[in-house]
Amino acid sequence: MIKVLVACANGAGTSLIMKMRVEKACKDLGVEVSTIHHCSLSEGKSAATQYDVVFCPLNFKNMFTDAEKKGVKICGMKNVLSDKEAQALLKEAGFAE
């Protein structure tokens, strides 16, 4: 089971939409999730190391380099509305086949 963090600038609209896409992608790929949390970038940056994977808009991916150095997979999404992109990123991160 993995712990997923989804972050956007304000932690409201975009991260909630991304959370729904990631939940659907995990379900479709059979990835078991223990926790999925959405939040603002500032909260996400400080909490990222407590998660296995972080999803954020691609232009904010560089904010999570410290967590990435500690083994957290960082998935930057180009299209936050895309189920297929969320699935592809989960596969690239090694959580699904």
Language-model regions, residue ranges each:
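Conserved active-site segments centered on acidic
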Residues: 2-41
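Glycine/Thr-rich phosphate-binding loops of Rossmann-like dinucleotide-binding domains
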Residues: 14, 63-64
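Structural signal for conserved beta-strand scaffold positions within catalytic alpha/beta enzyme cores
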Residues: 38, 56, 76-77
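Short, polar loop motifs at secondary-structure junctions
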Residues: 41, 58-62
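A short, aliphatic-rich alpha-helical micro-motif
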Residues: 47-49
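Conserved acidic residues
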Residues: 52
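Short, structured coil segments at secondary-structure junctions
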Residues: 68-70
